[in-house]
């Protein structure tokens, strides 16, 4: 598959989920950095390096909403695709976090996600 010259950061504490997302996207030419620990991902994050971040919402140490806030403070232009087994509103209520509207640079997909859903969402966000 041809390289699409887009770099994506994936943070999901479920190793198998992160690995699967990485393999799917790499097969379509994306350059992927994947982490299971949100603290390590935050330490390694560099502004203006990523075209998209894919963040699980339910993670230990730092949930996806908190991680998003910290990444966004370092790179205001970052686009984020939240992914969770919970609905977006349930995840928000569970973590008592700031509710981010799902629009433009912020989108949400509920697990389990199909390859087609994932690719459609990713391509629409990295244009």
Report each predicted region and the residues it spans.
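Receiver (REC) domain active-site loop signature in two-component systems and cognate sites
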Residues: 59
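Acidic, metal-coordinating helix/loop segments flanking the phosphotransfer/catalytic sites
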Residues: 34-52
């Amino acid at each position: 598959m041809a390289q699409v010259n887009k770099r994506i950061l994936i943070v999901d504490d479920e190793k198998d989920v992160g690995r699967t997302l990485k393999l799917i996207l790499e097969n379509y030419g994306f350059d992927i950095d994947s982490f299971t620990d949100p603290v390590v991902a935050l330490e390694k994050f560099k502004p203006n390096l990523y075209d998209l971040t894919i963040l699980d919402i339910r993670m230990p140490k730092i949930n996806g909403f908190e991680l998003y806030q910290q990444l966004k403070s370092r790179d205001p232009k970052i686009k984020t695709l939240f992914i969770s087994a919970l609905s977006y509103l349930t995840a928000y209520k569970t973590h008592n976090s700031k509710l981010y509207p799902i629009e433009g640079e912020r989108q949400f997909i509920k697990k389990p996600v199909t390859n087609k859903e994932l690719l459609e969402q990713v391509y629409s966000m990295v244009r």
